[in-house]
Amino acid sequence: MALPFRKDLGDYKDLDEDELLGKLSESELKQLETVLDDLDPENALLPAGFRQKNQTSKSATGPFDRERLLSYLEKQALEHKDRDDYVPYTGEKKGKIFIPKQKPAQTLTEETISLDPELEEALTSASDTELCDLAAILGMHNLIADTPFCDVLGSSNGVNQERFPNVVKGEKILPVFDEPPNPTNVEESLKRIRENDARLVEVNLNNIKNIPIPTLKDFAKTLEANTHVKHFSLAATRSNDPVAVAFADMLKVNKTLKSLNMESNFITGAGVLALIDALRDNETLMELKIDNQRQQLGTSVELEMAKMLEENTNILKFGYQFTQQGPRTRAANAITKNNDLVRKRRIEGDHQ
């Protein structure tokens, strides 16, 4: 059922507003403007350039001539008499002229230094090279730099071959360039995983922040049927909980992946719990990294991690910094136990 104010609205959709406004007289336009002012007194619906109304309805007296206006203003300025000063200037100078005081010239008097006759004789008979070596030993680098005989090539005390500068300069800082972007082709890698390429064993998507979330989910979906990729890393790719859930579903099916890196992302406790639940039945994954997420995971999540590590004997490396002492100790003991089991299996295999 149509509303009353929309009952006849369809009859006015094809009307031309410009044609209707053109047929209105001046009085009708003013009346329409008054009605619009009542509806929108602040003119909020109009652009800023159309809110100012015409201040006068007078017709122009003539065309605007800029040069004529400038000449008129200049003529008016020249004909206008300057205002007389209230206090006329008489030329009288008040006060005194500042004359700086002359400071007496300081005369430097040389201090007479008396040395022992042996030292006096040794310094008098010393060569330029010996004097340069002596100044270097005493730390008088300014003297060495100012003297013309500071070339100390072949000095016996191992003084540097170069001149000693007057200004101490800091160590030259070597420029540190940014790391190059990740050269991995995302679309090509996804295609090769989907085709189960035997040459593709490791996929590195680290620090590629423009990968869409659906594309990351596609990686998880294609890894379910892949039998060659053993290392997959997507650190710092802005992955969130839906991506973590997709990879958790992949871990329940995949029997080839050995290492998974999901550090430095936006995964919360819910996404981490999904990964932990998937690892309870996974027997192939040996390394998982989930540290440095956007927010702390909490004590309950850390307890679930420790419980999973105690049940899953295949995890040898677990990348997470525990905040609680209890889960940290349990996880460390579980990882140590798992590595000991691998060592025992290797020893038994060597004996057989």
Swiss-Prot record:
Phosphoserine sites (modified residues): 25
Q: Where in the cell is it found?
A: Cytoplasm, Cytoskeleton
- Pfam families, alphabetized: Tropomodulin
* Molecular function GO terms recorded: actin binding; microtubule minus-end binding; tropomyosin binding
Query: Does this entry carry the keyword Lyase?
Result: no
Give the principal location in a single coarse category. Answer: cytoplasm
- Which biological process, per GO, is one annotated for this protein? cell motility
Keywords recorded for this protein, A-Z: Actin-binding, Cytoplasm, Cytoskeleton, Phosphoprotein
Explain the purpose of this protein: Blocks the elongation and depolymerization of the actin filaments at the pointed end. The Tmod/TM complex contributes to the formation of the short actin protofilament, which in turn defines the geometry of the membrane skeleton.
Please report which protein family the annotation says this sequence is part of. Answer: Belongs to the tropomodulin family.
Q: What is this protein called?
A: Tropomodulin-3
Q: Lineage of this protein's species?
A: Eukaryota, Metazoa, Chordata, Craniata, Vertebrata
